[in-house]
Amino acid sequence: MALTPMMQQYLDIKKQHPNTILFFRLGDFYEMFFEDAKLASQELEITLTGRDAGEPERVPMCGVPFHAADSYISKLIEKGYKVAICEQVEDPKVTKGIVKREVIRVITPGTLMDGSMLSEKDNNYLVAISQTSSNNCGMAVADLSTGLFQVTEMEGHWSLESLLDEILRLTPREVLLTPDLKKHEKTVQAFNFLPSTVFTTLEETQQVSDYIELLNNQFGQKVSAVYKDRPAVCMAAGILLQYLINTQKRQLNHITEITAYSPRAYMMLDGIARRNLEISKSLRDGDKRGTLLWVLDATKTAMGGRMLKNWLEQPLIDTLKIQERLDAVEELVNSILLREEISGALKQIYDLERLAARAAYGSANGRDMIALRGSLEKLPFIHDALAAVSSTRLKRIYTEFNTLSDLRKVLDLALAENPPVSLRDGGLIKDGFDQEVDQLRNAARDGKTWLAGLEAREKENTGIKNLKVGFNKVFGYYLEVTRANLSMVPEYYQRRQTLANAERFITPELKEYESMILGAEDRLVELEYNLFVAIRAKVAAEVSSIQKTAALLSEIDALVSLAEVAVRNGFVRPEVTDNGIIEIKDGRHPVVENTQGLGGFVPNDTYLDIKEERLCLITGPNMGGKSTYQRQVALIVLMAQVGSFVPAQRARIGIVDRIFARVGASDDLTSGQSTFMVEMYETKQIIDHATAKSLVIIDELGRGTSNLEGMAIAQSVIEFLHDEVGCRTLFSTHYHELAELEGLLRGLKNYATAVKEQGDEVVFLRKVVRSKASKSYGVHCARLAGLPTSIIRRASELVMQLEFHQRAAQEVVAGKTQIAAASEQLAMFTPQEDQVKEEILALNLTNMTPLESLNFLDNLQKRLREMQ
């Protein structure tokens, strides 16, 4: 049995788009068939039906109304699917046979344009990566919704790893991969870190020369001149652009610039540090609340919010650029009038980047254009407010600022005040803009007046008081009479439609005027549409200028946000230097103090340099505030290099090239790694990549293995960071014995979180002081957690016994290190074992290496177990 022509057409189109859900336009619905229908009905929770298609059995089918399709498409995209939109490209009224249909666009997670599918203050990144035979890696990044198109390149042994760190920073919605990269170990790690990202593997790629030609066509010959010797970059950029062209099936006129950047021009933050410092996503649920961005984001526009987020994820390392930003923030802090004038205008500005992109893309509707016009009206106010600024960056913004006054005038003259959403419903063009529009509009209005008069006359002539004139798209204009009054209908009424409780009629006079009215309305709608498209094209021609102005507005918005937050929270301007000193007086954690309420947070001092005090070893009880303090220092440094004021009484920040934050650990179930393996992997990242200019924070290293091994590893890492790397480090530990290292490592200083004991009660003061801890107070924490009294009492008894054995076991380990081989939790010796004690006392420690010492202790441990 042969398929119907329509179903054959569907299958032919589906064959060209195999990895998508095909939305196939049939009248007022988008229909899906076969496996697409089964999948869509399940994911969208809509009814699965069937359709006769010329096969023995009805084929599975489901559908959604075309006017409500966006919400259904959004749900599918959110779940990681791709949707191909297949439209009727011929008018069914004038077409004989089957209507021609084509896929006009493929919507993927990385190619969204509709504002309802996008997060306002987040970029929607699409990324492509490539790797050459020389192991150089290229990456291209696009945000179709804004027109952004950037490229970067990584070289050397760590190129792919560095590139994947950059992908983690971007958190793209979609990543394009070549087949060889899909199976690479580092790429698989990215899969685990980015569960919401769709990874699309390309079946085939072209030659670099073909991609260069494609890029030249989009961006001009400068691509050949600038990137011809960078094949990895050209490959990634070409893959990305080709994918956009293939999916969008139109000119990408809003993508006008290709810009290169280097991640090394910014502070480097790997995925571990970003996660642990909670810069833009909280550890608890991945939300913005509870993050540094949540505290600092007082932006008024969506594009300003996106820029501020990018600043936080790419802190500066150039002192001059940081000072420029700080100067601008300081000027805004000191001028409440300037802040209020700018903020007031910014509140009324829409997302210019995305509005301009939609105009150039050809998808902007009347309301988009009204939003654009309203936004442009506020630009002169911002420009005037900046006229008297003195800081270098704000002055430059003022000089470069384009108010786009000519474009604003065009939109003001042309656009109606309240246009409909649809471009085919008329009402787009303002009265007085076009003579023909005015004439047709008057004809339509006169027709409506005539219809009202006809209704009044017919009521009088027939005596039917509830007679009314109506209209629908199928039958046109009609006279409606209820059944109770049908006996009063005159003979010249011609029946047009029968309803349950009424009849609809037409008269020769009404038929004549209907042709005139509808003809005028149809011509008016078509003319308004064409005029609107022409006006939209004028906006598209100015897309580059709009994008530049939008970038300046974004920067102003981000700077004003930093100033407002600084005033609200009592932040101060940091002194940023290149001398390597980090000195903070009364520093506060910016997020914690906002969740606790201002004034409730206990401030702490910090001092680190690159010589005498480069490693702070912090001991103290759990819940004492060690982790909060470490994160606090890292966030203050990061904020300073963003160009933000900081939560402190005073701060001097020596530039940091990278921040590493190994804080806390848990099993990684997705990769099958234990807590200890996660710790070791994260520590290896620090060992491999930290430099003398880095800031390292390590919290509680050595958990997940025995106390002996954990302490040995912790000490080894401390020694390596101190001796080999020389970076500034905050190292917190529950191994209090490591405090003995202070006299042996020149740049190590002991700090502890202060505790106040009141009888059996303990008060955590949250104060970091120059000292070393003597107790862990774990039993007290257990009491606070609500463990049963019997367990608390028994634990206290055991602690007393174990502390006695610990004192008996303490010994000195050779060379520059001193360490206690026994832990609080493990009793290795008893007073009765005289022979063991004699061996310990007889040790010649000066001639033993640390490894020999540990082997000796291991041997003792085995012997003692045998004695039990």
From Swiss-Prot:
It holds the Pfam family MutS_V. One of its GO terms (molecular function) is mismatched DNA binding. One of its GO terms (biological process) is mismatch repair. It comes from the Bacteria. Keywords: ATP-binding, DNA damage, DNA repair, DNA-binding, Nucleotide-binding. This protein is involved in the repair of mismatches in DNA. It is possible that it carries out the mismatch recognition step. This protein has a weak ATPase activity. ATP binds at residues 620-627. SUPFAM superfamilies: DNA repair protein MutS, domain I, DNA repair protein MutS, domain II, DNA repair protein MutS, domain III, P-loop containing nucleoside triphosphate hydrolases. PROSITE patterns: DNA_MISMATCH_REPAIR_2 (PS00486). Belongs to the DNA mismatch repair MutS family. SMART domains: MUTSac (SM00534), MUTSd (SM00533). This is DNA mismatch repair protein MutS. Disulfide bonds: none annotated. One of its GO terms (cellular component) is cytosol.
